[in-house]
């Protein structure tokens, strides 16, 4: 008989539903919801800073796909044995991002490359964009952590604390029973009660979101320093959470790889905060250029045509003026010769 402590947090009975043959995964829905929230918040903040509304969505067309690819690459690279080891899941599972597994550092790094490309095309300073989107990113991470809750993953060791998370055995369609069965449905039997480390990180991310908003409003942070503050603050929380996690991960000297990454990135973020210019960018620099390269070329061509016409008019004026003077002089001479005088 299974004894259930009502004080514990129960896991969801399942993390995937089916709409006919199409699987609807809670993890994917959480990722999408996080991205939408980040874009809405980022767009409003960009407009408040003096930028054009809607620009954030244009940049996202580059940044989001790059970020998803980068996040998955980082996850696979730091968990190589799971996919390509002796008993690995294979390349099919390696690209199945909808089943969970995104590394934030890869997402930020490659997403930053996509954002840089888009900002360069629009003539927008990348640091200003990063500051506008930073609070939205950390909130998106918090929302995304809910996906780990549905997957019963990213947890810590056993605990008897009242906020411990109950992990249920799940049975898949083929009858397989396992705690980490992403496609299964709960049997109702509790396998163990553990630290919900994903929840700890979720709460930390929400706190960082609030702090970034408050600090930015009070001190008018710019030039990429607010984004660096987000990175530094996130690293602190991630480092602490990594110390509590017990799920399999690549380690160096008994330390999880994400702990090393968090430390190095934290140092870099703090250095940037100290060295970057103070204050905020001039709103006039956030206007950028039209999103369409063709539109920009048409504008330039129109201006060039106008300049050419002005030049031709000037040249015609210089050439025609002497001819007009000569004609007037000829008429005057004819009038004098004929004795005609105006009275």
Curated annotation (Swiss-Prot):
Residues 283-343 are annotated as: Disordered. Disulfide bonds: none annotated. The chain crosses the membrane at residues 22-42, 54-74, 97-117, 123-143, 193-213, 257-277. GO terms for biological process: lipoprotein biosynthetic process. GO terms for molecular function: phosphatidylglycerol-prolipoprotein diacylglyceryl transferase activity. One of its GO terms (cellular component) is plasma membrane. Keywords: Cell membrane, Membrane, Transferase, Transmembrane, Transmembrane helix. It is a multi-pass membrane protein. It is found in: Cell membrane. The keyword Cell membrane applies. Its EC number is 2.5.1.145. InterPro entries: Lgt (IPR001640). It is an enzyme of class 2 (transferase). Pathway: Protein modification; lipoprotein biosynthesis (diacylglyceryl transfer). Its main location: membrane. PROSITE patterns: LGT. A 1,2-diacyl-sn-glycero-3-phospho-(1'-sn-glycerol) binds at residue 145. Residues 295-325 have a biased composition (Acidic residues). Catalyzes the transfer of the diacylglyceryl group from phosphatidylglycerol to the sulfhydryl group of the N-terminal cysteine of a prolipoprotein, the first step in the formation of mature lipoproteins. Belongs to the Lgt family. This is Phosphatidylglycerol--prolipoprotein diacylglyceryl transferase. The lineage of its organism: Bacteria, Bacillati, Actinomycetota, Actinomycetes, Mycobacteriales. The gene is lgt.
């Amino acid at each position: 008989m299974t004894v259930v402590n009502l004080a514990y947090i129960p896991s969801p009975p399942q993390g995937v539903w089916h709409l006919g043959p199409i699987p609807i995964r809670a993890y994917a829905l959480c990722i999408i919801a996080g991205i939408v929230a980040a874009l809405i918040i980022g767009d409003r903040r960009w407009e408040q800073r003096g930028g054009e509304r809607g620009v954030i969505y244009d940049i996202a067309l580059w940044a989001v796909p790059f970020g998803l690819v980068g996040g998955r690459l980082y996850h696979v690279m730091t968990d190589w044995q799971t996919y390509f080891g002796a008993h690995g899941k294979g390349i099919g599972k390696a690209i199945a991002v909808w089943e969970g597994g995104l590394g934030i550092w890869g997402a930020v790094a490659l997403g930053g490359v996509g954002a840089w490309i888009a900002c360069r095309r629009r003539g927008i300073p990348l640091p200003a964009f990063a500051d506008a989107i930073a609070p939205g990113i950390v909130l998106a991470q918090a929302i995304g952590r809910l996906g780990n809750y549905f997957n019963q993953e990213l947890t810590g060791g056993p605990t008897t604390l009242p906020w411990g998370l109950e992990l249920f055995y799940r049975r898949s369609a083929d009858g397989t029973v396992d705690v980490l069965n992403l496609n299964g449905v709960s049997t109702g039997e509790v396998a163990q009660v553990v630290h919900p480390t994903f929840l700890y990180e979720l709460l930390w991310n929400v706190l960082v979101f609030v702090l970034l908003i408050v600090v930015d409003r009070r001190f008018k942070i710019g030039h990429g320093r607010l984004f660096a503050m987000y990175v530094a603050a996130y690293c602190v929380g991630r480092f602490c959470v990594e110390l509590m996690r017990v799920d399999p991960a690549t380690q160096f000297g008994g330390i999880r790889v994400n702990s090393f990454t968090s430390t190095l990135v934290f140092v870099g973020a703090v250095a940037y905060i100290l060295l970057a210019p103070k204050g905020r960018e001039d709103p006039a620099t956030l206007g950028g250029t039209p999103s369409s390269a063709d539109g920009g070329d048409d504008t330039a061509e129109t201006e060039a045509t106008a300049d050419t016409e002005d030049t031709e008019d000037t040249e015609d004026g210089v050439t025609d003026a002497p001819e007009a003077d000569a004609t007037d002089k000829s008429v005057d001479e004819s009038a004098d010769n004929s004795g005609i005088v105006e009275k």
